[in-house]
From Swiss-Prot:
It is found in: Secreted. Binds 1 Ca(2+) ion. It holds the Pfam family Phospholip_A2_1. This is Basic phospholipase A2 Cdr-13. SUPFAM superfamilies: Phospholipase A2, PLA2. It comes from Crotalus durissus ruruima. The lineage of its organism: Eukaryota, Metazoa, Chordata, Craniata, Vertebrata. InterPro entries: PLipase_A2, PLipase_A2_Asp_AS, PLipase_A2_dom, PLipase_A2_dom_sf, PLipase_A2_His_AS. It catalyses: a 1,2-diacyl-sn-glycero-3-phosphocholine + H2O = a 1-acyl-sn-glycero-3-phosphocholine + a fatty acid + H(+).
Length: 122
């Protein structure tokens, strides 16, 4: 669920998902278009694409179990959808951590008008 993804982001990056990622670049937050602006934005388009593959799952609201062991997230047992959603969120949260060095506060609330390039496909 988005609540768990938000928690993973905080645990991985030390930043709250809102406001630091909810409106970042062209792809973080709801929807997206154009080209990703940097590594952080690329994490978000990859996450969007991961969710797109789970067409029969309720990606935003399905609750899943996970734990943090030795600094790594482990997705718990659950339905196929719950496990896949957890994996999408886990990979994205870890990607956001790896991208912290290139995070730019100037892209934190990025105007849609700057996302006009042709959109990337999954």
């Amino acid at each position: 669920s988005l609540v768990q993804f938000e928690k993973m982001i905080k645990e991985e990056t030390g930043k709250n998902a809102v406001p630091f990622y909810a409106f970042y670049g062209c792809y973080c937050g709801w929807g997206g278009r154009g080209r990703p602006k940097d590594a952080t934005d690329r994490c978000c388009i990859v996450h969007d694409c991961c969710y797109e593959k789970l067409v029969k799952c309720n990606t935003k609201w399905d609750f899943y179990r996970y734990s943090l062991r030795s600094g790594y997230f482990q997705c718990g047992k659950g339905t196929w959808c719950e496990q896949q959603i957890c994996e999408c969120d886990r990979v994205a949260a870890e990607c956001l951590r790896r991208s912290l060095s290139t995070y730019r506060y100037g892209k934190m609330i990025y105007p849609d008008s700057r996302c006009r390039e042709p959109s990337e496909t999954c």
